[in-house]
């Protein structure tokens, strides 16, 4: 045999073919010939390598170097550098998502290293059209053993011992199925391979057939020996041309070598295989429908019993297994059932191949032991979710399966656990979905698929799937009504119980599982006409506006920027947002996460454009609003929720008095967010506009102290409680009460209340500060401490990607010189003479997943260390201080120290006169959600009063009509988001000047033109 110094294994699966591997291979051969290397280096087209996301792929054997995403233009350089000069081309190595280092070796890449290959043991290693390469890797050895050394009963016993269960979906024990067929009387029996892989997102069987067809043929021969069959069929859909081609080649080679046909290996055993091409009907994946199709009839299921093992194809005993099941058989017989059962769980033995696809970085084929956790498959092997998005759920089992949500990432993926969670293993399609997927729309999609694929033979499936689809479609279109969810559940139960075959019996699974885990989304679609994923387009004008908690007309004000009408743009913003300047600086801009421009390049900088308008527009004069209502309203707390509610109620004619315990209004806007992010003049200007409407704001007035609770209750007709969450959570460690230990909120409040004292040095943090936490308050505290002259280290117990703080704030902190230490947890604060001198910490590693989808930090024993510091700032969370509420008030406080509110009136407490909102109800949240809570509370309060008085609902006055221009560039060219100008880090770290400088006119106009105007109605 000719020896080559290198074999270049080029992936030749359908996925890589689609990515251009055929052209890459051709040029590779040409370049090697051109340089006279064809006698030293051999190019081999293999089957699917498995890492479909990175194709075209080439492995250099025996070096083990793997090249990915090869383009035709890369090939000449690659040949010259690697095979002529001996310098591997690093830019074509694999790079893990979010990391810069490139990995040259295949076995160092987590996608490959963490798998356990049994079915896929030959993937990417052999030429699937060369039987000799298969034989060289123990191919047909299991078959030879079965035919020459074992009786049919021994073959069945070995398969039973292995614990192998059918990999086509049902999970029925393979050995038991074979035993039934073996014991069925009859001279004619059939072995059938189900290669009719019809699940959306599934490509396991196709890839096995393309990469290792002989493994399937070997398994079929062994099955034939076990049951006494002489003829077999592979039922493969015609839309798999490459798989069919390679099967035909494999069949021809096997016959030529005496491994198929008459007298196999001289044993006197006869068996041959025929390929039957199916038309691609999903129902033909059901075993009796598949057999009916082979018989030349329309593929429709038959009632059972009799079962196929007794009367299957042409009423003869038949065994049907899918591709993956049969591909296991050769190795089970060769190595023994105990070897196979050595991995997996007690009831689910061996490995399972998954087609990992959807919203995951490493799309491809994954083979892992049964019992591997869902999180390990998606994150450790799959590389997590692209684009910084959050995992939502995984659909397992295709249209017949169910979704497994984020709180079950630690779930063991085996037959029993998957069924317990409401899904099925299916053939192994694993579709990962991020937060941008709608659970209701997903259920509608799969029901639409099942409805189309229903054969129509039985009424429950034929009519039931159509009726369920109608209901789901109506919900997605905003036409859902109360009772629809319960009706879906009822119909699903009937269909599951009454349908003839597996298609109908499992069709309701996606609906039932999404209702089970995402019932709130169904309710939002029906009651609120809202799709939180911004998918169901009938429910909104544009994704950005729909995602904004207050529904700002974002496309409108961006269009007005483009038209240079900033005054009108400002008016549009003020319709829904009383704090546009504030939100242009500190909003968490969730709208941008749903901006469709982000699918092309980067989202439109909505937040920065909002700021541009508020910084540059002429502000309209605010005039007092007359009091037209007799009812008086008290608001407790002058934060964004309280002030928004006050403004809305004043505009409805109510007399409103706001009680604020701090010296100035604004809540966390004034007392928590530092001025380098939100200058006080900007905030004060927008609060003054609310005052001008006639809202009275009494500062330095704490309810329960300066004004008794009883007096508020007596003097006012309604009270809105919006005190915010101004109390830091304690760390719960020894030494927390030493001097020099601050809560994050308390430190920021103290600084903002006494800036001169801190700046003059009367108050000091010392030279070294440790900040504990990873949220926005932690970053704010750290950057404030830095500006006061300290050397600052942030200690966070997880990784950077887990930090709740805004990504841009983390980057800004790092640019300013703040050090962030990850996987660190505080053990205790150490001190001397009653003052903190250090913090003892423990290093962490990541364990399993918590309910939020983040990995839990686990302590590393013996990793303790002490960090010498002068001050410790604990910013690990906040809670409301509701101590001002008397126990006898009738206002209930829940176990999270937040107000309890009713379901039917979203902001009404357990005392009907008292309403509540903002952080005091939800816990620490965002500015824009607090504003939304204020809007909602004003509507609830006004509605409750009017209903009590027997009055009609409030009708808002007619608004000024503002013409919104519609201009969209005919050709959309990729263009990144405009960069926000900032003060230089070395300068800004020494003062509290505003860091972000705002867009200039040309920047704003250019950014505004990037808007795709998703609000357009066609």
What label would you give each PLM region?
Residues 1-7, 21-45, 62-91, 142-159, ...:
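Ferredoxin-type iron-sulfur electron-transfer modules in oxidoreductases and energy-metabolism complexes
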Residues 655-698, 782-828, 951-965:
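Rossmann-like dinucleotide-binding cores of NAD(P)H-dependent redox enzymes
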Residues 612-626, 685-705, 728-788, 893-910:
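Glycine-rich dinucleotide-binding loop and its adjacent helix/turn
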Residues 737-767, 849-924, 963-969:
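FAD-site-proximal beta/loop scaffold in flavoenzymes
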Residues 631-657, 778-786:
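N-terminal Rossmann-like FAD-binding beta1-loop-alpha1 element of flavoenzymes
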Residues 781, 920-948:
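A conserved FAD-binding loop/helix module that cradles the flavin
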Residues 627, 632-636, 684-733, 828-840, ...:
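Feature captures the FAD/FMN-dependent oxidoreductase FAD-binding
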């Amino acid at each position: 045999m000719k020896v080559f110094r290198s074999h270049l294994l080029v992936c030749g699966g359908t996925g890589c073919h689609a990515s251009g591997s055929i052209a890459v291979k051709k040029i590779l051969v040409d370049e090697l010939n051109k340089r006279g290397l064809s006698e030293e280096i051999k190019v081999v087209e293999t089957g699917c390598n498995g890492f479909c996301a990175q194709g075209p792929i080439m492995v250099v054997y025996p070096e083990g170097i793997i090249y990915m995403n090869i383009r035709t233009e890369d090939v000449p350089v690659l040949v010259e550098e690697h095979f002529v000069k001996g310098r591997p081309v690093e830019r074509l190595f694999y790079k893990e998502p979010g990391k810069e280092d490139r990995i040259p070796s295949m076995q160092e890449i987590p996608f490959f290293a963490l798998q356990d290959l049994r079915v896929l043991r030959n993937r990417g290693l052999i030429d699937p059209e060369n039987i000799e390469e298969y034989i060289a890797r123990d191919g047909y050895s299991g078959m030879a053993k079965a035919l020459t050394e074992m009786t049919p009963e021994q073959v069945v016993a070995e398969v039973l011992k292995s614990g192998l269960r059918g990999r086509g979906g049902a999970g029925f024990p393979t050995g038991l199925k074979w035993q039934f067929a073996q014991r069925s009387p009859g001279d004619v029996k059939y072995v059938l391979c189900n290669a009719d892989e019809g699940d959306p997102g599934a490509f396991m069987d196709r890839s096995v057939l393309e990469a290792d067809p002989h493994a399937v043929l070997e398994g079929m021969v062994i099955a034939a020996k076990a049951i006494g069959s002489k003829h077999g069929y592979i039922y493969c859909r015609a839309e798999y041309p490459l798989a069919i081609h390679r099967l035909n080649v494999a069949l021809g080679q096997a016959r030529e070598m005496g491994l198929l046909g008459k007298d196999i290996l001289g044993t006197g055993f006869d068996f041959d295989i025929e390929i039957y091409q199916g038309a691609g009907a999903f129902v033909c994946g059901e075993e009796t429908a598949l057999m009916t199709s082979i018989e030349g009839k329309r593929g429709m299921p038959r009632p059972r019993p009799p079962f196929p093992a007794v009367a299957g194809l042409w009423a003869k005993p038949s065994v049907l297994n899918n591709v993956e099941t049969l591909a296991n058989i050769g190795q089970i017989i060769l190595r023994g059932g105990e070897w196979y059962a050595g991995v997996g769980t007690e009831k689910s033995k061996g490995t399972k191949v998954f087609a990992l696809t959807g919203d995951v970085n490493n799309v491809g084929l994954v083979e892992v032991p049964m019992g591997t956790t869902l999180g390990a498959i998606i994150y450790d092997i799959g590389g997590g979710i692209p684009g910084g998005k959050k995992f939502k759920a995984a659909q397992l089992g295709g249209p017949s399966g169910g979704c497994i949500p984020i709180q079950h990432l630690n779930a063991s993926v085996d037959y029993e656990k998957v069924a317990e969670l409401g899904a099925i293993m299916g053939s192994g399609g694993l579709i990962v979905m991020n937060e941008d997927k709608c659970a209701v729309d997903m259920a509608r999609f799969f029901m639409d698929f099942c409805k189309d694929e229903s054969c129509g033979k039985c009424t429950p499936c034929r009519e039931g799937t159509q009726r369920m689809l109608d209901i789901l479609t109506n919900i997605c279109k905003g036409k859902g009504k109360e009772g629809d969810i319960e009706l879906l559940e009822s119909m699903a139960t009937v269909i599951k119980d009454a349908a003839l075959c597996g298609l109908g019996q499992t069709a309701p699974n996606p609906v039932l599982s999404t209702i089970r885990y995402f019932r709130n989304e169904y309710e939002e679609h029906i009651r609120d006409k809202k799709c939180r994923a911004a998918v169901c387009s009938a429910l909104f004008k544009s994704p950005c506006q729909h995602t904004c908690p207050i529904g700002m007309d974002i496309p409108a004000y961006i269009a007005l920027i483009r038209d240079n009408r900033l005054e009108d743009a400002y008016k549009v913003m003020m319709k829904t947002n009383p704090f546009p300047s504030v939100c242009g600086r500190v909003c968490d801009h969730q709208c941008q996460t749903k901006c469709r421009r982000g699918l092309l390049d980067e989202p439109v900088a909505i937040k920065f454009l909002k700021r541009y308008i508020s910084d540059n527009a002429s502000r309209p004069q605010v005039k007092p609003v007359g009091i037209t209502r007799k009812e008086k309203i008290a608001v407790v707390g002058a934060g964004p929720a309280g002030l928004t509610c006050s403004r809305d109620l004043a505009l409805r004619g109510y007399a409103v008095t706001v009680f604020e315990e701090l010296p100035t209004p604004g809540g966390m806007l004034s007392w928590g967010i530092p001025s380098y992010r939100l200058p006080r003049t900007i905030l004060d200007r927008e609060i003054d506009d609310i005052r001008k409407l006639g809202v009275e704001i009494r500062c330095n007035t704490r309810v329960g102290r300066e004004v008794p609770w009883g007096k508020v209750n007596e003097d006012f007709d309604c009270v809105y409680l919006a005190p915010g969450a101004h109390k830091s959570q304690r760390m719960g460690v020894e030494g927390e009460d030493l001097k020099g230990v601050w809560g994050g909120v308390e430190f920021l409040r103290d600084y903002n209340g006494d800036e001169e004292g801190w700046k003059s040095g009367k108050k000091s943090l010392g030279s070294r500060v440790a900040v504990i936490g990873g949220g926005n308050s932690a970053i704010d505290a750290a950057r404030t401490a830095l500006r006061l002259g300290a050397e600052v280290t942030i200690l966070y117990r997880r990784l950077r990607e887990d930090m709740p703080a805004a990504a841009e704030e983390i980057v800004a902190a790092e640019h300013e010189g703040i050090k962030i230490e990850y996987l660190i947890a505080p053990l205790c604060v150490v001190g001397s003479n009653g003052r903190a001198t250090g913090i003892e910490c423990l290093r962490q590693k990541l364990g399993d997943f918590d309910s939020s989808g983040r990995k839990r930090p686990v302590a590393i024993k013996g990793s303790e260390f002490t960090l010498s510091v002068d001050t410790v700032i604990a910013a690990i969370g906040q809670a409301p201080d509701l101590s001002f509420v008397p126990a006898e008030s009738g206002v209930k406080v829940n176990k999270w120290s937040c107000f309890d509110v009713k379901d039917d009136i979203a902001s009404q407490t357990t005392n009907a006169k008292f309403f509540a909102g903002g952080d005091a109800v939800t816990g620490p949240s965002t500015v824009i959600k607090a504003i939304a809570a204020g809007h909602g509370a004003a509507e609830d309060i006004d509605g409750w009063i009017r209903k009590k008085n027997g009055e009609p609902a409030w009708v808002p006055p007619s608004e000024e009509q503002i013409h919104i221009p519609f201009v969209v560039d005919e050709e959309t060219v990729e263009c990144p988001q405009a960069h926000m100008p900032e003060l230089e880090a070395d300068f800004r770290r020494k003062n509290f000047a505003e860091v972000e400088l705002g867009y200039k006119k040309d920047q704003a106009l250019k950014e505004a033109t990037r808007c795709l105007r998703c609000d357009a109605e066609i």
